[in-house]
Amino acid sequence: MKALNLDDKYYPVGAMIAAISDAKNKLLFASDFRKQARDFYQQKVADVYEYYERELRKNNALDFDDLLLVAVKLLQSNEAVLDKYSKRFRYVMIDEYQDTNHAQYLLAKLLASHWKNIAVVGDADQSIYAWRGADIQNILDFEKDYPNCTSIKLEQNYRSTKIILDAANAVIENNEGRPKKNLWTDKTEGAKIQHFTAQSEHEEAAFIGDTIAKKHDIHGVPYGGYGHFISYECSVSCT
């Protein structure tokens, strides 16, 4: 950022990294991104991207996103390379397919183009990585991309109770474009779900602490019998 005289207060390093990563996941080199930059901020992102790309080339290096971008571009532009590797990989298997981005989707499609033996596992109702480029449409369109495929629904749940699954079904049935399925279990009903909305982080922490203390004092539940899951955000800062 210093090399381009950009103030990281207005152009945070984390935001620049995310924007460049998103562009690469959409198969855009720096020059491609420059052409579609629509406003002043995007022009600055393009400046950073071009500088970063030059530095990578100076060091004969690729970053993680380049491993996908360059591979896809190579397979798309060189028929001999595509023919070699699509024949080499007779079977392509992918887990968590709902979390694939555009570059990963195309790479899989290219590698499976000869034998067309592709098996994917995924759940259209639990895509949570759109913020880093995941495209839910990849799994929703799988049967259109491979019309001769066989789909197997895994609807029995071995982990959760019936009450949990009933609540989950009630929520996910509102998702648009999803393939219909109904989660079920042969476990018992289970404890009722408790829901609490806090007005602040302090109120949330106090509620959790009070609840655990009451369970311990009234029912003798040991403190070590609890687990606390939180959503945590952190920013990337480079000096």
Give the positions of each predicted feature:
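Conserved P-loop NTPase-based nucleic-acid remodeling module centered on helicase motor cores
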Residues: 1-24, 28-40, 47
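P-loop NTPase Walker
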Residues: 3, 83, 137, 166-169, ...
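Conserved phosphate/pyrophosphate-binding and hydrolysis machinery centered on Walker-type P-loop NTPases
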Residues: 6-13, 35-42, 61-65, 101, ...
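Proline-centered turn/helix-capping motifs that create local helix->coil transitions or kinks
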Residues: 8, 24-30, 116, 171-181
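Conserved helicase NTPase motor core
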Residues: 38-141, 153-160
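Helicase P-loop NTPase motor core
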Residues: 147-150, 155-239
